[in-house]
UniProtKB/Swiss-Prot annotation:
The lineage of its organism: Bacteria, Pseudomonadati, Pseudomonadota, Gammaproteobacteria, Pseudomonadales. It is an enzyme of class 6 (ligase). It comes from Pseudomonas paraeruginosa (strain DSM 24068 / PA7). GO terms for biological process: modified amino acid biosynthetic process. InterPro entries: GCL_type2/YbdK_subfam, GCS2, Gln_synth/guanido_kin_cat_dom, YbdK. Pfam families: GCS2 (PF04107). ATP-dependent carboxylate-amine ligase which exhibits weak glutamate--cysteine ligase activity. It catalyses: L-cysteine + L-glutamate + ATP = gamma-L-glutamyl-L-cysteine + ADP + phosphate + H(+). The keyword Lyase does not apply. This is Putative glutamate--cysteine ligase 2. Keywords: ATP-binding, Ligase, Nucleotide-binding.
Amino acid sequence: MIDSRADHGLRFGIEEEFFLLDATDLDIARTAPSGFLEACRAALGEHFAEEMFECQVEVASPVFADLAQAARFHGRARQRLAQLAAGFGLRALCVGTHPFADWRRARSNPAAHFARLFEDQGRVARRSLVCGLHVHVEIPASHDRMVVLQQVLPWLPLLLALSASSPFRGGRRSGLASYRRALCGEWPRMNIPPALPDEDAYRRHLALLRESGCIREDGQVWWMVRPSSHVPTLELRICDACPRLADALCLAGLFRALVGQALLAGDAPAGPAARDACLEENYWQAMRHGCAGRYLVDGRCVNARDWLERAWRQCHPQARQGNEWAYGHAQRLLEENSADRQLQRYQALRAEGRGRQAALRRLVEELLEENLQALPAI
């Protein structure tokens, strides 16, 4: 049960991305029907946004003080988006990759901002038919966001492992728990951030990238975690979109606790050589194996459950406050995350005698059901 009492922790926000599907065949929609985007803007206001493909949209939250507020907002937003989509012959699906969609069918958004992305990144952008979960946590002005970033960075593969929801690509098993992150790796500036010591160094780095023509704007630094370019937050970007809202809330709470611990600790992060040596391997383990990965932590090889327990023990009680439900839910996620569940259901459906396409369609139906699953009591 999520504690609905307002805690005094860090304020945060959540962004969820969705695929738009044709309701008849559950494949990605070629384009949004006339009037659909306008209806979404009217219903969701500033919290609704288009994405880089015409078959994608995003819901971005207001600022929350606790997880119960986030649950109420996103629960209602998911329901409203589903209702609006149904009225236009669509379905809205929140998941890292669509299990059987062909990325070559997706139409790029012609808006100028997205057109520049496709011009700059070419086929890399065209292939990136993926949905993510982004979490913003507010950083007080008295703290340096890059120092906080370097401290939470080593824990991020654990959050990816918990969120992994993209084991399929184009109707085939990808062999990865998070194929989305493999696609992210094709982009520049989208994986592990460099070991910049503080925000002054970060601003100098951005200036160099702009002056050299590598980026058009600061927002084109898309690391797995980054200082936001428009609000005073640290933005988590590593996680796959979560079919179950409860999983997204869990990840937001865990990230919030880790940021809170970094703010309380105030210690300098580990040296970049030691950090990168284990971080790269742990990132691969999370991408490939998810919660079944073997992780290098403090000179030892541990499983995801041990790593989660270490992360929680490290957090001061003040950092844990208001996030206890997230830790409890994460323990359950370790038993079966979305990638595990999708693979198991696909195998079971094939064992029942369904063909590959029929099994994949049924899997999408079940993911759509998960998107609107009732939350634990709040």
